[in-house]
Amino acid sequence: MSQGKIVQIIGAVVDVEFPRNEVPKVYHALKVDGTEITLEVQQQLGDGVVRTIALGSTDGLKRNLVATNTERAISVPVGAGTLGRIMDVLGRPIDEAGDVQASDHWEIHRGAPSYEDQSSSTELLETGIKVIDLMCPFAKGGKVGLFGGAGVGKTVNMMELINNIAKAHSGLSVFAGVGERTREGNDFYHEMKDSNVLDKVAMVYGQMNEPPGNRLRVALTGLTMAEYFRDEKDASGKGKDVLLFVDNIYRYTLAGTEVSALLGRMPSAVGYQPTLAEEMGVLQERITSTKSGSITSIQAVYVPADDLTDPSPATTFAHLDSTVTLSRNIASLGIYPAVDPLDSTSRQMDPLVIGHEHYDTAQRVQQTLQKYKELKDIIAILGMDELSEEDKQSVSRARKIERFFSQPFHVAEVFTGSPGKYVSLKDTIRGFKAICDGEYDHLPEQAFYMVGSIEEAVEKANKMSAKA
């Protein structure tokens, strides 16, 4: 193994000089002797000098320290030994429960599956969340993005999806915490532990307080672990169906921006790295389903300043099968989950895939909400009395639909005091179809707020009238 000397340190960027005939390749990992720090080669500057990014704090590093080339990319433990464990970007345990007992190690830089290995699925994944199941259904083996600005509920929605899908899902899950709050990572760990599914989850964290190198690579570490479960065939010759949760994909882009600036690249639009689309593609193209197994991925995407045209969320959109857009306006009405049904999309929204009843109900709900949106200006200026009877009916139904989209979450029980509700797709379609048909025109709109199925709304209305 060749050895070089550190010649320059600028923040997280470290330049190392090697003999000219032993220069490491790009993405090779270097170990700094006498420390725990790993460096990843990013550029070859010539004259034997390579520019690297430190995966860890560079505090205490100094010039002339020896760095050894491992002659391979960063490798992380994979397999059953990672389940129930919390690891960092290098696959080292951070849960104080001893070493990770892994039978194999895989490099985090890997190619995407070839076209002939990939497979697509139209099987629906029920989430138990009414607005998602009805308006932007998820596909098994698909990619889902939860888009939203600061504080509109991306992480809570993701936790509820984990609660509803990962617990009911007999397969394995991998959670990659990319540049988010350590507290949320801790909450997730305890949530999984309390519900006895910790032995089916591998957790990889590179949180907000970590250097940009860690935050840039931690998503790849989590993905590599998920790929192993997908590709490693069991006795029947099949891989597994894996759930991959990433919170938050925007921080991956942001870490890339920081690294890009440190490496001296010219910034592009809004200060992002010039390689934004390529970096996103490298990650997203690997999150796919093959003939042996599937990866269903749910990614939270922070939207800077609520601007969906910002280059980072705009680049992410192209890779997704379903987009769940969280709206600040809906959150301000107290309707949670604050999903915007007119702005959320799904490739599954096809009568041949989801069935005619589901498709027709979703379309009618959308039309009713769109009509209400158009009438809002008239109502604001002239008031409800100026509307025709037909328009008044549309507005009344739209307001009931809006409130019926709200739902108490299991993960928020501690804060709200009301027990969480899981609503099956069948009940969801039945409830919204009945509202659109006018079967519940006589009920007050408040009865539809924060309930599960339509029967609960009727029960709530009866209680309200009894009190009155």
From Swiss-Prot:
Keywords: ATP synthesis, ATP-binding, Cell inner membrane, Cell membrane, CF(1), Hydrogen ion transport, Ion transport, Membrane, Nucleotide-binding, Translocase, Transport. It comes from the Bacteria. ATP binds at residues 148-155. It catalyses: ATP + H2O + 4 H(+)(in) = ADP + phosphate + 5 H(+)(out). Pfam families: ATP-synt_ab, ATP-synt_ab_N, ATP-synt_VA_C. GO terms for molecular function: ATP binding; ATP hydrolysis activity; proton-transporting ATP synthase activity, rotational mechanism. Its EC number is 7.1.2.2. It is a peripheral membrane protein. GO terms for cellular component: plasma membrane; proton-transporting ATP synthase complex. It is found in: Cell inner membrane. SUPFAM superfamilies: C-terminal domain of alpha and beta subunits of F1 ATP synthase, N-terminal domain of alpha and beta subunits of F1 ATP synthase, P-loop containing nucleoside triphosphate hydrolases. CDD domains: ATP-synt_F1_beta_C (cd18110), ATP-synt_F1_beta_N (cd18115), F1-ATPase_beta_CD (cd01133). Produces ATP from ADP in the presence of a proton gradient across the membrane. The catalytic sites are hosted primarily by the beta subunits. Belongs to the ATPase alpha/beta chains family. F-type ATPases have 2 components, CF(1) - the catalytic core - and CF(0) - the membrane proton channel. CF(1) has five subunits: alpha(3), beta(3), gamma(1), delta(1), epsilon(1). CF(0) has three main subunits: a(1), b(2) and c(9-12). The alpha and beta chains form an alternating ring which encloses part of the gamma chain. CF(1) is attached to CF(0) by a central stalk formed by the gamma and epsilon chains, while a peripheral stalk is formed by the delta and b chains. NCBIfam families: atpD (TIGR01039). This is ATP synthase subunit beta. It comes from Xanthomonas axonopodis pv. citri (strain 306).
